[in-house]
Curated annotation (Swiss-Prot):
Membrane spanning residue stretches: none
Alphabetical UniProt keywords: Cell inner membrane, Cell membrane, Membrane
The protein's name in its UniProt record: Protein Syd
Membrane topology: Peripheral membrane protein
Family recorded in the similarity comment: Belongs to the Syd family.
Pfam families: Syd (PF07348)
GO cellular component: cytoplasmic side of plasma membrane
HAMAP family named among the record's database cross-references: Syd
Gene, per the UniProt record: syd
InterPro entries according to UniProt: Syd (IPR009948), Syd_sf (IPR038228)
Subcellular location(s) of the protein: Cell inner membrane
Species: Klebsiella pneumoniae (strain 342)
Role this protein plays: Interacts with the SecY protein in vivo. May bind preferentially to an uncomplexed state of SecY, thus functioning either as a chelating agent for excess SecY in the cell or as a regulatory factor that negatively controls the translocase function.
Amino acid sequence: MDHQTAEALRAFTQRYCAAWQQQRNSLPRSEELYGVPSPCVVDTQGEAVFWQPQPFSLAQNISAVERALDIVVQQPLHSYYTTQFAGDMTGRFADETLTLLQTWSEEDFQRVQENLIGHLVVQKRLKLAPTLFIATLESGRDVISVCNLSGEVIKETLGTAKRITLSPSLASFLSHLEPVL
């Protein structure tokens, strides 16, 4: 496990949860995750769940992605996807407001790996350098990803070679990410 990435993710999650406590006097709340089972669910009100992060309970790797494409995934990405179960969290990095994707449950972890595999298959078909997404942007065509060759965090336009480097590492990116509610 890449401890720097795991610690940076836990620290951002703590900042995010603290922002909810300070600004809304509650745990993080999600309507999108209502009705979806997770060890993170603390309470349900109306059609929303209140959640808090929980320790990841499965093998701490995304080896299914590696096996499917016969590649080696950078260690920070293994750590990112297997540090915790949590709801997706919004944040800001420089001028980008994004939704940091998280694994909500054991079942969700399988879906996340399938989506990563699909993303990598499309990139391979288009002869693009492999990336694994970690966040979405409002545009829908752009995502925040980690380049599997360099380890850099990039903003990429899906299906194209358009990429902008945002941070030299995933740990650095997470350390500079600010919560947005």
